[in-house]
Amino acid sequence: MNFISIECEELFLDYMNPNNPFGQKKDKRIENWISLLSKMPSLENAKSDLLSGVIIKGKCNGSDEKVIENLLSELLPWRKGPFKINNTFIDSEWRSNLKWDRFLELNLDLKEKTILDVGSGNGYYAFRMLGQEAKAILCLEPNLVHFSQFLAINQFIKTNKIRMLPERLETLEIKDTHFDIVFSMGLLYHQRDPSNHLNCLRNRLKEEGQLVIETIVASNEYGDYLEPKGPYASMPNVHFVHTNKGFMDLAEKEGLKVISNSTEVQTTLNEQRQTKWMPFKSYESAVLETHQDITVENFPAPKRKFYVLEKFS
């Protein structure tokens, strides 16, 4: 049985070698990642709770527990999570469960849906989508560290309903496959051409499909968008941070209408922070110590928002 479609199945032809899931990708770390994955102990009678988190429980001896923790720690930094594998708790930089809870408030039904998750990171959200009984999820994530993390976690979960390609949407050779729901979370403000990004996402929707955008929104004082022309909240490659009006106008130009949206939520040190599993600079270095609603570049601190869109009929 094909994964979503014959066309999707063919995308994985270069990644079918069980001894090298990285296909033709070039990176000096790949050999180490392959070795790490081959050494990962298995869990006997493993069971996964993907509804309340990404929680995996199974039988293994004490020494294997430590091996699992040590091997997973070699895949730093863990940006998205958390994950719990028996006694190993991966306390990621982002408490992604908080964003997921905000998504659930939109009451979007994922049951038996085919989903495209663009810029999926290590697959945390895809696992949570599976917990909501999604039919199949295609993840696109060009970052090979995140791709390796997904491969490691899925060695325990062993689902074939989620598959990840280390590719970008814009370069993907896919024309005839369309999805019930397409996700783009935390990507729009990194696009040099946000119109093209929305158009690429729209082109992957079924006629009655829904597009979920999660992004940073700027205050209305900036007109259509804030253009940092440099780092924003210590993030490089932030090109346009749209206002609510600016995003609505952009979506309309691309043949999309907003059917629902969430309230704006300001990022906090509780949601994004430095941890043992992401020991580098984090949000605490992105905002002023005395005024956490102001970035170190003197912009308003990030506020994030969900939009659900459909094609104009």
What are these regions (language model features)?
Residues I216-V238:
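Short, glycine-/aromatic-enriched active-site segment of Class I SAM-dependent methyltransferases
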Residues K113-G121:
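Conserved class I S-adenosyl-L-methionine
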Residues N122-E133:
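Conserved SAM-binding loop of SAM-dependent methyltransferases across substrates and taxa
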Residues D180-P194:
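A short SAM/SAH-binding and catalytic strip from SAM-dependent methyltransferases
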Residues L172-V182:
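A short acidic, Gly/Pro-enriched loop at the edge of an enzyme's catalytic core
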Residues S195-Q210:
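A short glycine-rich, Lys/Arg-flanked "PGG" loop and its adjoining helix->strand segment in the class I
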Residues M1-S96, E227-P228, E271-E289, P302-V308:
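N-terminal accessory regions of S-adenosyl-L-methionine
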Residues H239-G255:
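Short alpha-helix
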